[in-house]
Curated annotation (Swiss-Prot):
Residues 280-302 are annotated as: Disordered. Coiled coil: none annotated. It catalyses: sulfate + ATP + H(+) = adenosine 5'-phosphosulfate + diphosphate. It comes from Shewanella denitrificans (strain OS217 / ATCC BAA-1090 / DSM 15013). The keyword Nucleus does not apply. One of its GO terms (biological process) is hydrogen sulfide biosynthetic process. NCBIfam families: CysD, PRK05253.1, PRK12563.1. Pfam families: PAPS_reduct (PF01507). Heterodimer composed of CysD, the smaller subunit, and CysN. The keyword GTP-binding does not apply. This is Sulfate adenylyltransferase subunit 2. Keywords: ATP-binding, Nucleotide-binding, Nucleotidyltransferase, Transferase.
C-alpha cells in the first residue's frame, strides 16, 4: 500500500483544517475574526474547505474602527456576498461619539478604544466562547510564545506566564462561563507559506497587497496612503504619487506602505524570498509603547 507523502503546504493545511473542525465540534458558540487581510483570507479559505460542501457553521466578525482602507471594506462586502457566510460587524459607538481617531488621540488610545475595547464588546454581546484569529508565530515575538489555544479570562486578558501545555497537538479547550479561548490555526505558518498558499489555491486578496501607483504622504519616515480627506497635512508635508504596496493591512493612518515593483503574486513571492525586514515594520501600533504588542494582548487585543 502506497504511503501518501504530504507537501509542506499540505501538512500546514491539514493541521489548520483539523484545528478549525475541532473548535467547531468542541465549543458552543465559536466565531472567526475577519480582519480582511491576507491571513484572514487564507483562514476563510481553510474554513470553507473544512466544511465543504456545507456552509461555514459559525459567523465571521469584523471589528470596524471606521479607519480601514476603503478597498478593504469593499473587498469584505464582496467576499460576504460571493461566499454567503454570516458576517457580523461591530464598532465601538462610544468611541465614535467621543471622536476617537488615530490623528486626534494617537495610535495607542485609538487602538485600545476602537479595536481592543470594541472586540471585547462584540465578544461579550454575542457570548462567543472561542474566537479564531489569523495570527502567526513568525510575525512578532509575543505571538511566537502564544499557544494555538490561547486561554482568556473573564476580562479577555492573556497571561503569557500561565499558558496551558499543548503536547502532541492535544489542545485544552476547557473554559468556565465567561472565559474563552482565542484559537490560532495559522500559528505554524510563515509569511512565505501564506503567499505560496495564496498562489497555489488562487485565493482572492485585497488589491492593496499589489504594487501600484498610489497617493501617499511621508510622515515620520513612513509612507501613509491618503485614503480620504481626514488626513491632516503638517507643515512641509505633501501628497505624492509613488509605486507602493502593503505587506500588512490595518487602519490606514497606522499602516505604512513600502516601495515595490511586485504587482503579481509571483513577484511578491520572489520579494519575500529576498527580504530581511519584518512584515510588521509598517504597523505603527507595534512601536507606540514599550513591549507594545504583548501589552495590548494582555489587555484583550488579538
Amino acid at each position: 500500500m502506497a504511503v501518501q507523502v504530504l507537501s509542506h503546504l499540505q501538512q500546514l493545511e491539514a493541521e489548520s483544517i483539523q484545528i478549525i473542525r475541532e473548535v467547531a465540534a468542541e465549543f458552543d458558540n465559536p466565531v472567526m475574526m475577519y480582519s480582511i487581510g491576507k491571513d484572514s483570507s487564507v483562514m476563510l479559505h481553510l474554513a470553507r474547505k473544512a466544511f465543504y460542501p456545507g456552509k461555514i457553521p459559525f459567523p465571521l466578525l469584523h471589528v470596524d474602527t471606521g479607519w480601514k482602507f476603503k478597498e478593504m471594506i469593499a473587498f469584505r462586502d464582496a467576499q460576504a456576498k460571493k461566499f454567503g457566510f454570516e458576517l457580523l460587524t461591530h464598532t465601538n459607538q462610544e468611541g465614535v461619539e467621543q471622536g476617537v481617531g488615530p490623528f486626534t488621540h494617537g495610535s495607542a488610545k485609538h487602538t485600545d478604544i476602537m479595536k481592543t475595547q470594541a472586540l471585547k464588546q462584540a465578544l461579550n454581546q454575542h457570548g462567543f466562547d472561542a474566537a479564531f484569529g489569523g495570527a502567526r508565530r513568525d510575525e512578532e515575538k509575543s505571538r511566537a510564545k502564544e499557544r494555538v489555544y490561547s486561554f482568556r479570562d473573564r476580562h479577555h486578558r492573556w497571561d503569557p506566564k500561565n499558558q496551558r501545555p499543548e503536547l502532541w497537538r492535544t489542545y485544552n479547550g476547557a473554559v468556565n462561563k465567561g472565559e474563552s479561548i482565542r484559537v490560532f490555526p495559522l500559528s505554524n505558518w510563515t509569511e512565505l507559506d501564506i503567499w505560496q498558499y495564496i498562489y497555489q489555491e488562487n485565493i482572492e486578496i485585497v488589491p492593496l497587497y499589489f504594487a501600484a501607483d498610489r497617493q501617499v504622504v511621508e510622515k515620520g519616515g513612513q509612507l501613509i496612503l491618503k485614503d480620504d480627506d481626514r488626513m491632516p497635512l503638517e507643515a512641509g508635508e505633501a501628497v505624492k504619487t509613488e509605486k507602493v504596496r502593503f505587506r500588512t493591512l490595518g487602519c490606514y493612518p497606522l499602516t505604512a506602505a513600502m516601495h515595490s515593483e511586485a504587482d503579481t503574486l509571483e513577484k511578491i513571492i520572489e520579494e519575500m524570498l529576498l527580504t530581511r525586514s519584518s512584515e510588521r515594520q509598517g504597523r505603527l501600533i507595534d512601536s507606540d509603547q514599550s513591549a507594545s504588542m504583548e501589552h495590548k494582548k494582555r489587555q484583550g487585543y488579538f
